Protein backbone atom coordinates (compact mmCIF):
# COMPACT_ATOMS: atom_id res chain seq x y z
CA UNK A 1 0.00 0.00 0.00
CA UNK A 2 1.52 3.39 -0.98
CA UNK A 3 2.53 5.49 2.02
CA UNK A 4 0.49 8.48 0.82
CA UNK A 5 -2.67 6.35 0.68
CA UNK A 6 -1.93 4.94 4.15
CA UNK A 7 -1.65 8.48 5.54
CA UNK A 8 -4.98 9.33 3.96
CA UNK A 9 -6.70 6.32 5.60
CA UNK A 10 -5.26 7.29 9.00
CA UNK A 11 -6.55 10.82 8.55
CA UNK A 12 -10.08 9.64 7.72
CA UNK A 13 -10.12 7.67 10.97
CA UNK A 14 -9.42 10.86 12.91
CA UNK A 15 -12.09 12.98 11.24
CA UNK A 16 -15.10 11.98 13.29
CA UNK A 17 -14.78 14.11 16.44
CA UNK A 18 -16.44 17.46 16.96
CA UNK A 19 -16.43 19.19 20.33
CA UNK A 20 -18.11 22.36 21.48
CA UNK A 21 -16.06 25.54 21.28
CA UNK A 22 -16.48 29.18 22.28
CA UNK A 23 -19.88 30.53 21.25
CA UNK A 24 -20.68 32.86 18.41
CA UNK A 25 -24.49 32.53 18.40
CA UNK A 26 -24.26 28.73 18.31
CA UNK A 27 -21.93 25.86 19.19
CA UNK A 28 -19.73 23.90 16.81
CA UNK A 29 -21.71 20.75 17.64
CA UNK A 30 -24.89 22.53 16.57
CA UNK A 31 -23.22 23.53 13.31
CA UNK A 32 -22.07 20.01 12.52
CA UNK A 33 -25.47 18.52 13.37
CA UNK A 34 -27.19 21.10 11.19
CA UNK A 35 -28.98 22.64 14.18
CA UNK A 36 -28.34 26.35 14.26
CA UNK A 37 -30.32 29.55 14.63
CA UNK A 38 -31.20 32.16 12.02
CA UNK A 39 -27.93 33.80 11.06
CA UNK A 40 -27.05 37.17 9.54
CA UNK A 41 -23.31 36.52 9.15
CA UNK A 42 -21.58 37.13 5.81
CA UNK A 43 -22.01 34.36 3.22
CA UNK A 44 -18.70 33.35 1.60
CA UNK A 45 -18.03 31.68 -1.73
CA UNK A 46 -16.23 28.33 -1.64
CA UNK A 47 -12.71 29.42 -2.66
CA UNK A 48 -12.44 27.72 -6.04
CA UNK A 49 -13.61 28.25 -9.61
CA UNK A 50 -17.40 28.32 -9.98
CA UNK A 51 -18.87 24.89 -10.73
CA UNK A 52 -15.99 22.87 -9.25
CA UNK A 53 -16.74 19.94 -6.93
CA UNK A 54 -14.51 19.99 -3.85
CA UNK A 55 -14.15 17.65 -0.86
CA UNK A 56 -13.99 18.98 2.70
CA UNK A 57 -11.48 16.65 4.37
CA UNK A 58 -11.46 18.53 7.69
CA UNK A 59 -14.10 20.79 9.21
CA UNK A 60 -14.51 22.83 12.35
CA UNK A 61 -13.00 21.20 15.44
CA UNK A 62 -12.16 17.89 13.72
CA UNK A 63 -9.60 15.94 15.67
CA UNK A 64 -6.68 15.31 13.28
CA UNK A 65 -5.22 18.82 13.30
CA UNK A 66 -8.22 21.14 13.79
CA UNK A 67 -9.02 20.39 17.41
CA UNK A 68 -9.84 23.75 18.96
CA UNK A 69 -9.88 25.42 15.53
CA UNK A 70 -12.63 26.79 13.32
CA UNK A 71 -10.99 26.12 9.99
CA UNK A 72 -11.65 24.07 6.86
CA UNK A 73 -9.37 21.87 4.74
CA UNK A 74 -10.31 21.24 1.10
CA UNK A 75 -8.57 18.20 -0.41
CA UNK A 76 -7.51 19.23 -3.91
CA UNK A 77 -4.68 18.32 -6.27
CA UNK A 78 -1.51 20.40 -6.40
CA UNK A 79 -2.02 23.17 -8.93
CA UNK A 80 -5.75 23.60 -8.36
CA UNK A 81 -6.79 27.22 -8.95
CA UNK A 82 -7.77 28.97 -5.69
CA UNK A 83 -10.09 31.98 -5.82
CA UNK A 84 -10.94 34.67 -3.29
CA UNK A 85 -13.95 33.74 -1.17
CA UNK A 86 -14.79 37.42 -0.60
CA UNK A 87 -13.58 40.77 -1.90
CA UNK A 88 -10.95 42.63 0.06
CA UNK A 89 -7.35 43.84 0.21
CA UNK A 90 -4.35 41.51 0.29
CA UNK A 91 -2.42 42.27 3.48
CA UNK A 92 0.24 39.54 3.48
CA UNK A 93 1.58 36.79 1.22
CA UNK A 94 4.32 34.21 1.05
CA UNK A 95 5.16 32.38 -2.15
CA UNK A 96 8.80 31.18 -2.00
CA UNK A 97 8.62 28.01 0.11
CA UNK A 98 9.04 24.53 -1.33
CA UNK A 99 9.04 22.73 2.04
CA UNK A 100 6.23 20.66 3.47
CA UNK A 101 5.44 17.67 5.65
CA UNK A 102 4.38 16.73 9.16
CA UNK A 103 7.54 17.77 10.99
CA UNK A 104 7.23 20.67 13.48
CA UNK A 105 9.81 22.71 11.57
CA UNK A 106 7.38 22.94 8.64
CA UNK A 107 4.78 24.88 10.66
CA UNK A 108 6.25 28.17 9.45
CA UNK A 109 7.00 27.03 5.89
CA UNK A 110 3.59 27.27 4.23
CA UNK A 111 2.90 29.66 1.36
CA UNK A 112 -0.18 31.75 2.10
CA UNK A 113 -2.43 34.69 1.26
CA UNK A 114 -4.24 36.85 3.84
CA UNK A 115 -7.10 39.10 2.68
CA UNK A 116 -8.75 41.77 4.85
CA UNK A 117 -12.46 42.45 4.30
CA UNK A 118 -14.59 45.57 4.70
CA UNK A 119 -15.69 44.53 8.21
CA UNK A 120 -12.03 44.09 9.31
CA UNK A 121 -12.26 40.28 9.31
CA UNK A 122 -9.48 38.41 7.48
CA UNK A 123 -9.48 35.26 5.36
CA UNK A 124 -6.38 33.04 5.54
CA UNK A 125 -5.51 30.72 2.64
CA UNK A 126 -2.62 28.26 3.22
CA UNK A 127 -0.37 25.67 1.54
CA UNK A 128 0.02 27.19 -1.94
CA UNK A 129 2.67 25.58 -4.14
CA UNK A 130 6.05 27.28 -4.59
CA UNK A 131 5.67 30.43 -6.71
CA UNK A 132 1.96 29.64 -6.93
CA UNK A 133 0.62 32.84 -5.35
CA UNK A 134 -0.83 35.21 -7.97
CA UNK A 135 -1.42 38.33 -5.85
CA UNK A 136 0.75 40.76 -3.90
CA UNK A 137 0.39 42.83 -0.75
CA UNK A 138 -1.86 45.83 -1.37
CA UNK A 139 -3.80 44.26 -4.25
CA UNK A 140 -7.58 44.70 -4.31
CA UNK A 141 -9.32 41.39 -5.07
CA UNK A 142 -12.91 40.58 -5.93
CA UNK A 143 -14.99 37.56 -4.98
CA UNK A 144 -13.97 34.74 -7.32
CA UNK A 145 -10.71 36.32 -8.48
CA UNK A 146 -7.84 33.81 -8.84
CA UNK A 147 -5.27 34.26 -6.06
CA UNK A 148 -3.04 31.22 -6.48
CA UNK A 149 -2.52 27.50 -7.02
CA UNK A 150 -2.90 24.97 -4.23
CA UNK A 151 0.00 22.89 -3.00
CA UNK A 152 1.48 20.99 -0.08
CA UNK A 153 3.81 23.48 1.62
CA UNK A 154 4.03 23.99 5.35
CA UNK A 155 2.63 21.60 7.96
CA UNK A 156 0.69 19.36 5.60
CA UNK A 157 0.15 15.64 5.06
CA UNK A 158 -1.09 15.91 1.46
CA UNK A 159 -2.05 18.61 -1.09
CA UNK A 160 -4.96 20.71 0.16
CA UNK A 161 -6.16 24.24 0.85
CA UNK A 162 -6.52 25.36 4.47
CA UNK A 163 -9.09 28.17 4.80
CA UNK A 164 -10.14 30.12 7.85
CA UNK A 165 -11.72 33.45 8.72
CA UNK A 166 -10.69 35.50 11.74
CA UNK A 167 -12.76 38.35 13.16
CA UNK A 168 -14.68 39.69 16.14
CA UNK A 169 -17.13 37.42 17.95
CA UNK A 170 -20.23 38.61 19.83
CA UNK A 171 -18.05 39.55 22.82
CA UNK A 172 -15.68 41.61 20.68
CA UNK A 173 -12.81 39.11 20.87
CA UNK A 174 -10.72 38.51 17.73
CA UNK A 175 -10.71 34.78 16.91
CA UNK A 176 -11.48 32.17 14.26
CA UNK A 177 -15.09 32.31 13.10
CA UNK A 178 -17.32 29.63 11.60
CA UNK A 179 -18.60 30.90 8.25
CA UNK A 180 -21.46 30.13 5.89
CA UNK A 181 -20.94 29.42 2.18
CA UNK A 182 -23.06 29.55 -0.96
CA UNK A 183 -23.95 26.00 -2.11
CA UNK A 184 -26.67 24.28 -4.13
CA UNK A 185 -28.45 23.71 -0.81
CA UNK A 186 -28.38 27.43 -0.01
CA UNK A 187 -26.24 29.29 2.52
CA UNK A 188 -24.85 26.64 4.88
CA UNK A 189 -21.95 25.74 7.15
CA UNK A 190 -19.77 23.14 5.40
CA UNK A 191 -19.39 19.77 7.08
CA UNK A 192 -16.39 17.40 6.91
CA UNK A 193 -16.19 14.38 4.60
CA UNK A 194 -18.64 15.82 2.08
CA UNK A 195 -18.44 17.12 -1.48
CA UNK A 196 -19.71 20.59 -2.36
CA UNK A 197 -20.04 22.38 -5.70
CA UNK A 198 -18.73 25.92 -5.84
CA UNK A 199 -21.24 28.62 -6.76
CA UNK A 200 -21.54 32.40 -6.49
Task: Name the predicted role of every residue range.
Residues 121-144:
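Short histidine-centered loop motifs in beta-beta connectors
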Residues 2-11:
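Sec-dependent signal peptide recognition
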Residues 20-110, 191-200:
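Surface-exposed, glycine-biased beta-strand/turn segments
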Residues 58, 92, 127-130, 149-152, ...:
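A residue-level detector for short acidic-glycine micro-motifs
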Residues 82, 88-90, 138-150:
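A structural signal for short beta-strand/turn segments enriched in small hydrophobics and glycine
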Amino acid sequence: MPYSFFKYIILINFLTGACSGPKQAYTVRELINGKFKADSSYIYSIPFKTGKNVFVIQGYETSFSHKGERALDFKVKTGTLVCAAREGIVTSVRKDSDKGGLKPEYLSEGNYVIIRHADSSTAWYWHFKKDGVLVNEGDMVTDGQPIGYSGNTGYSAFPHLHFEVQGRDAAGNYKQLATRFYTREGAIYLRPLRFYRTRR
